[in-house]
């Protein structure tokens, strides 16, 4: 799976244990989803946040 699928579609689902919406992680476990958690101050593994807002452009 493309680790940055969330950046393109705004949603992703990782193995049923994790989901993202608009690049915000919901019920994610450690190193489950490569998307940005709320606040964009810290990112899941493999994701870099750009700027201070968390939207579909915050993942690369």
UniProtKB/Swiss-Prot annotation:
Residues 1-28 are annotated as: Beta. A divalent metal cation 2 binds at residues 6, 12, 14, 25. A divalent metal cation 6 binds at residues 36, 40, 43, 59. Keywords: Metal-binding, Metal-thiolate cluster. Pfam families: Metallothio. A divalent metal cation 4 binds at residues 32-33, 43, 47. A divalent metal cation 3 binds at residues 14, 18, 23, 28. GO terms for molecular function: metal ion binding. Metallothioneins have a high content of cysteine residues that bind various heavy metals. This is Metallothionein. It comes from Oreochromis mossambicus.
């Amino acid at each position: 799976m493309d680790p940055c699928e969330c950046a393109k579609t705004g949603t992703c689902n990782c193995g049923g244990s994790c989901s993202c919406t608009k690049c915000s992680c919901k019920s994610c476990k450690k190193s489950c989803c490569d998307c940005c958690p709320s606040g964009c101050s810290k990112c899941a593994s493999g994701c870099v946040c750009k700027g201070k807002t968390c939207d579909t452009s915050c993942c690369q």
